[in-house]
């Protein structure tokens, strides 16, 4: 009787195990929607994975500022030249006023004049300060700026060798504190206003002198820049 009872117990166990396996398969088929097996397996694996949060791509600001200027201001950025291959740039309200791409920058002092009321550029000129007598024409150009004008000045290569006293006086009259400190191949940027006052917190000028020990480029100092936001005229 014992062998018979043992065999019967094995049969019952096999049948029970088969029923459990069939029922488990049935439940799995009902729970997983009709989809490729690979997709189902991926879904199961993904249950334990943490969601990956992607940081949004930073929005580009006017003149490549890190933070946006208020809507009631003008954005500007002035960049001096650096070495032979780094040309000076003047950007205003995300418009390149002077730069290598436009072909309107050259050795010396580069100047852009902007109408403060409209925000439109009125004139751009470059003046070679290494060769030729260009201090006189530059002085007249600066003095020709109409009232309520913004003047942006940047150097590329040398801006001091042929810079005479009259030109220095004209730039000094606009508020420059560094024009008389200019040396051979000094990097210099300056923002001025004619017929209006700029806010005191705005950085208006920056200079970097050539130094054989510290020059970034052979014979030239590193380029320098200033940027900021100028309040628009209130209507």
Swiss-Prot record:
Highly expressed in the pancreas. Also found in the colon, kidney, prostate, small intestine and testis. Its main location: secreted. It is found in: Secreted. Glycans are attached at residues 120, 208. It comes from the Eukaryota. Keywords: Apoptosis, Cytokine, Disulfide bond, Glycoprotein, Lectin, Secreted, Signal. 2 N-termini have been observed in the mature protein: the first at Glu-30, resulting from signal peptide cleavage, the second at Ser-46. Residues 72-233 form the GG-type lectin domain. GO terms for cellular component: extracellular exosome; extracellular region; extracellular space. Residues 1-29 form the signal peptide. Disulfide bonds join 63-91, 69-229. One of its GO terms (biological process) is insulin secretion. PROSITE patterns: GG_LECTIN (PS52031). Pfam families: ILEI (PF15711). Induces apoptosis of alpha and beta cells in a dose- and time-dependent manner. This is Protein FAM3B. The gene is FAM3B.
């Amino acid at each position: 009787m014992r062998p018979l009872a043992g065999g019967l117990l094995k049969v019952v166990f096999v049948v029970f195990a088969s029923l459990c396996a069939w029922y488990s398969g049935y439940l799995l088929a009902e729970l997983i929607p009709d989809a490729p097996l690979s997709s189902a397996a991926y879904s199961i694996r993904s249950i334990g994975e943490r969601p990956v949060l992607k940081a949004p791509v930073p929005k580009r600001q006017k003149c490549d500022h890190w933070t946006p200027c208020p809507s009631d201001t003008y954005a500007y950025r002035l960049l001096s030249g650096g070495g032979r291959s780094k040309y000076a740039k003047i950007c205003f309200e995300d418009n390149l006023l002077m730069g290598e791409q436009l072909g309107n920058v050259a050795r010396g002092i580069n100047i852009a004049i902007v109408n403060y009321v409209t925000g439109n550029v009125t004139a751009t000129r470059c003046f070679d300060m290494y060769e030729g007598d260009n201090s006189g024409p530059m002085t007249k150009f600066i003095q020709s700026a109409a009232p309520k004008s913004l003047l942006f000045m940047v150097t590329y290569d040398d801006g001091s060798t042929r810079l005479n006293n009259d030109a220095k006086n004209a730039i000094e009259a606009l508020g420059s504190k560094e024009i008389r400190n200019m040396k051979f191949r000094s990097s210099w940027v300056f923002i001025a206003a004619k017929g209006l006052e700029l806010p005191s917190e705005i950085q208006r000028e920056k200079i970097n002198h050539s130094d054989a020990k510290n020059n970034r480029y052979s014979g030239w100092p590193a380029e320098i820049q200033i940027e900021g936001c100028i309040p628009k005229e209130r209507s």
